[in-house]
């Protein structure tokens, strides 16, 4: 399959070019030329399939034309060496637990898949010394560093904001050594992301160092995140709760929810999505006004969502042909303060004995009918 740029000013690229380059020549984000709907029989029997079997069917729709079936299957099965259980929290509210991977971050799925896919392409081409740049507010750095650790021909550079990453996550990517280098930046996540983007915009530097990105701007990082939306639906179906499913995604850089929207375009029976923001409510404001106004990020206790200019908004716009009406018809938005997040963590523990992290609390609060009326 070919990939085009969201800016529409660059030549189409192969999957290999899109993965290795990360960003298109016109600085746009790569998008697949087509999104293949999966057949109805897949959805009819999805509740009988394992996570790996479901993920392989989804991966084949995206990558099957470019990667041999046995290789793709091995990449999928190696990536998904852990479960992603759907756990009931309250009546009709479930939590898809994405923290069972090696670094306890939801990005373990995308990070591990990309590491294996990029490793395959590099080995295939006999390429050496590819440099992966990644900006992180915590979880991306951990997941990508762990996924790429020890992969031949690849060196990873993690840029993270000083004093704005949890101690355990900082240790997860600063103590590995080998082919992982961590760089502390005196600034915010947005500053780190700007540095990564600036490196890609420097054509000479890009070519000399063979740069690619492991942030969700890379198609190999964000597309595999679609796997677990299908698995969540399978688990809902097993529980007899698959009708009129609403999925709320705590959202920062918008790679995760974009992967879910791709799933919906492939026929995944989801009624609508909710993007839950903290005080960095750029998308929420876009839904209200129709205007996208990025601004410097604000530090919150849901720090992985502290993004003032979400990169993947360009993909959301492209997916819906720039139509605010079409986006609003399928995606709702919410925004919460630190005080509201703390309140939700406390109340959910008290009422349901389920411990939410601050990001999950944003998602739960949006789904809780006491807090939000769903359309």
What name fits each language-model region?
Residues 1-373:
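PLP-dependent amino-acid enzyme catalytic core
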């Amino acid at each position: 399959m070919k990939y085009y740029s969201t800016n529409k000013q660059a030549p189409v690229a192969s999957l290999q070019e899109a993965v290795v380059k990360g960003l298109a020549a016109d600085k746009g984000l790569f998008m697949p030329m087509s999104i293949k709907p999966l057949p109805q029989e897949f959805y009819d029997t999805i509740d009988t399939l394992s996570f790996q079997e479901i993920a392989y069917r989804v991966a084949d729709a995206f990558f099957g034309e470019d990667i041999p079936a046995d290789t793709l299957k091995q990449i999928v099965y190696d990536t998904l060496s852990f479960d992603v259980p759907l756990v009931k929290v309250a009546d009709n509210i479930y939590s898809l637990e994405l923290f069972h991977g090696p670094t306890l971050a939801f990005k373990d799925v995308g990070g591990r898949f990309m590491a294996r896919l990029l490793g395959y392409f590099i080995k295939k081409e006999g390429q050496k010394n590819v440099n992966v740049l990644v900006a992180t507010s915590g979880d991306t750095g951990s997941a990508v560093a762990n996924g790429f650790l020890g992969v031949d021909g690849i060196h990873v550079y993690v840029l993270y904001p000083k004093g704005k990453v949890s101690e355990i996550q900082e240790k997860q990517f600063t103590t590995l050594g080998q082919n992982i280098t961590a760089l502390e930046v005196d600034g915010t996540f947005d500053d780190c992301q700007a540095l990564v983007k600036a490196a890609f915009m420097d054509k000479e530097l890009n070519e000399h160092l063979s740069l690619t990105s492991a942030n969700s701007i890379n198609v190999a990082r964000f597309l595999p995140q679609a796997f677990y939306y299908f698995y969540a639906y399978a688990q809902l179906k097993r529980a007899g709760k698959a009708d009129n499913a609403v999925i709320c995604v705590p959202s920062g850089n918008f790679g995760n929810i974009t992967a879910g929207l791709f799933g919906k375009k492939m026929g995944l029976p989801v009624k609508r999505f909710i993007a839950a923001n903290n005080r960095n409510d750029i998308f929420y404001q876009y839904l209200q006004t129709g205007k996208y106004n990025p601004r410097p990020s604000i530090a919150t206790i849901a720090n992985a969502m502290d993004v003032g200019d979400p990169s993947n908004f360009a993909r959301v716009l492209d997916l819906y042909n720039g139509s605010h009406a079409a986006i609003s018809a399928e995606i709702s938005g919410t925004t919460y303060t630190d005080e509201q997040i703390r309140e939700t963590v406390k109340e959910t523990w008290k009422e349901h004995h389920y411990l939410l992290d601050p990001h999950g609390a944003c998602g739960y609060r949006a789904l809780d009918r006491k807090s939000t009326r769903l359309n």
